[in-house]
């Protein structure tokens, strides 16, 4: 009887845990997804300056690359698609129901989303709710038409009371009476546009309608929330509950303590970009490989036991080549990704990121610069089934080197980065990839014995012939065709 009772209690505890996990909106459990940030700063512009190195990323341009994107990525993060044209990158858009932007027309955007969906790739909308651009003066706004979700025209009463528009003499609402303003900001101020008062029912209804419209009308699958330092996390939870996105990621460029606070405010109904993990990757550049260890100060959400909520990255549109706009946050010493040195740094960081827990987000300039190598690492991650909650079984760092063993759904990997020499294949493993300057990164793989038709095959094989069919990557090797998990297809 006692054993039965213990068994029942254990079952109930597991069931409760599973229910709690299921209730985390926008946080897929044990998520195997790999994400692509499909833009960089000003990459909508015609080829000039930096843009000529990495290519333009308007909707029309990305449409030409959907086959390669579908093969390698599960989620693609788009820039803000709200318009109208003339709003640049889009982080101070003026009319959210207008999806004609500097990135392209609404029709091309819809065509691109449909093309990615055909390859089972999900699309992440960049959602800016903290602030918005104005219409003709500092304090009026375009009307948004969200179809069955409603029509909304915000006013100066929906602007935060302490916004600079009320204290700048050039503003049309300078010195407005408090009764004609919103409440005080619930987060940090952004002085580039009007900060919206999320305690306001009008702002809440507008935000919920926009989120629902993006998913159900525009057919996005999830959200990347911009500037979430600017409003309390309870409101983000409210908007996610209204829309129910597949995945939600908060941009919270701050300390681990502040990120943990945000997750608590949202009741863990979002993920966050792991900025502290990004900073730990600089150890590869400066030779301090110990920074990659979990027990180090800057190792991010994994150190806090929150890897499930981490979206890891090396660089993004704000940290890469912003002309000093955000200080010295770029991963590589320069933006010259044709440099052998920078390539070596990025590929080591990619090998680390793509073999570790969290949901890895590959930056577009890195992908287009080192497509073959990064695609190869992605395929290894997918073959082993590394996921957002994968256990790091062991890790060790020494002078100029780091290695770790990670458990996936279908196998284990050992990743080594740095100055290893005369490496021998660990017992029970096979070499999956070796690359970089003098083997600066190496991955070994050991597949679980069940369910794998040919566990000895290294994929993707440099000897095999890769081809794409119905948006999926296959490799012909000898007499057989294999998928990226090593299973014999024919």
Where are these regions (language model features)?
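Active-site-proximal helices and loops of the catalytic beta/alpha 8
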Residues: 24-41, 64-70, 88-91, 97, ...
């Amino acid at each position: 009887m006692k054993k039965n009772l213990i068994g029942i209690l254990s079952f109930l505890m597991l069931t409760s845990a599973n229910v709690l996990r299921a209730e985390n909106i926008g946080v897929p459990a044990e998520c195997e997804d790999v994400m692509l940030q499909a833009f960089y700063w000003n990459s909508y512009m015609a080829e000039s300056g930096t843009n000529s190195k990495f290519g333009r990323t308007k909707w029309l341009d990305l449409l030409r690359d959907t086959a390669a994107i579908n093969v390698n990525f599960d989620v693609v993060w788009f820039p803000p698609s709200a318009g109208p044209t003339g709003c640049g990158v889009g982080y101070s858009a003026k009319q959210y129901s207008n999806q004609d932007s500097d990135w392209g027309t609404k029709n091309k955007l819809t065509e691109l989303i449909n093309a990615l969906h055909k390859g089972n790739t999900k699309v992440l909308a960049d959602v800016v709710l903290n602030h918005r651009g104005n219409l003709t003066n500092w304090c009026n706004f375009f009307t948004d038409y969200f179809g069955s979700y409603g029509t909304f025209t915000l006013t100066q009463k929906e602007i935060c009371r302490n916004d600079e528009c009320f204290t700048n003499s050039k503003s049309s609402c300078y010195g407005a009476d408090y009764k004609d303003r919103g409440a005080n900001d619930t987060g940090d101020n952004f002085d580039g546009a009007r900060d919206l008062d999320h305690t306001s029912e009008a702002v809440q209804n507008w935000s919920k309608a926009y989120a629902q419209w993006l998913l159900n009308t525009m057919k996005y699958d999830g959200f990347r929330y911009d500037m979430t330092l600017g409003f309390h996390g309870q409101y983000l939870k409210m908007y996610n509950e209204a829309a129910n996105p597949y995945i939600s990621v908060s941009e919270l460029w701050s300390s681990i303590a502040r990120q943990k606070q945000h997750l608590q405010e949202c009741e863990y109904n979002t993920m966050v970009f792991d900025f502290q993990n990004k900073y730990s990757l600089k150890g590869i550049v400066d030779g301090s490989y110990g920074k990659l260890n979990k027990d180090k100060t800057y190792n991010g959400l994994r150190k806090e036991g929150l890897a499930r909520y981490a979206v890891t990255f090396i660089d993004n549109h704000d940290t890469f080549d912003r002309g000093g706009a955000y200080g010295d946050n770029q991963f590589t010493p320069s933006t010259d990704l044709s440099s052998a040195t920078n390539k070596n740094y990025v590929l080591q960081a990619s090998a680390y990121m793509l073999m570790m827990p969290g949901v890895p987000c590959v930056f577009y300039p890195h992908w287009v610069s080192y497509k073959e190598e990064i695609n190869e690492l992605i395929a290894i991650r997918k073959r082993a089934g590394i996921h957002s909650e994968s256990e790091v079984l062991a890790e060790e760092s020494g002078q100029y080197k780091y290695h770790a063993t990670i458990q996936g759904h279908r196998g284990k990997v050992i990743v080594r980065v740095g100055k290893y020499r005369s490496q021998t294949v660990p017992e029970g493993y096979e070499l999956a990839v070796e690359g970089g300057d003098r083997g600066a990164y190496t991955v070994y793989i050991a597949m679980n014995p069940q369910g794998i038709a040919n566990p000895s095959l290294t994929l993707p094989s440099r000897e095999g012939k890769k081809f794409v069919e119905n948006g999926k990557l296959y490799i012909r090797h000898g007499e057989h065709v294999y998928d990226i998990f090593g299973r014999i297809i024919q």
